[in-house]
């Protein structure tokens, strides 16, 4: 297993990136500003994002990532990126981020049958 630290700071000062870890090229743990340092090809192969909690420094790049990779994932016939989190965290994302006001609802785009994101509830102690 390879873990690449993309960010581990709570700020965006010069040289700092907010929390995000890339595991084996296709799994993100949190989606802070460090995700922006990945190439489009690196972003396109991310299949899972595990979100520890809904603070902006941990979820900020989910929408940006989804927007960036929609065409490339569709061209490669990739499944939706699965965003795994506790139900309250997913509810916060749906209500406050992917609501059509702050950011488009990528669980319904580019279309309902083939969205770029899928929100997947997990429970404490669950093995995924």
Where are these regions (language model features)?
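Binuclear metal-dependent hydrolase catalytic cores
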Residues: 1-128
């Amino acid at each position: 297993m390879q873990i690449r630290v993309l960010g581990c700071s709570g700020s965006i000062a010069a040289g700092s990136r907010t929390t995000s870890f890339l595991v084996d090229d296709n799994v993100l743990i949190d989606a802070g500003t460090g995700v922006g340092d990945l190439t489009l090809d690196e972003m396109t192969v991310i299949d899972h994002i595990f979100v520890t909690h809904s603070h902006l420094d941990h979820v900020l790049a989910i929408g940006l990532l989804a927007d960036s990779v929609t065409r490339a994932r569709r061209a490669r016939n990739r499944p939706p990126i699965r965003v795994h989190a506790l139900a309250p965290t997913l509810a916060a994302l749906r209500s406050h981020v992917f609501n059509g006001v702050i950011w488009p609802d990528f669980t319904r785009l580019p279309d309902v049958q083939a969205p770029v994101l899928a929100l997947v509830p997990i429970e404490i102690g669950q093995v995924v």
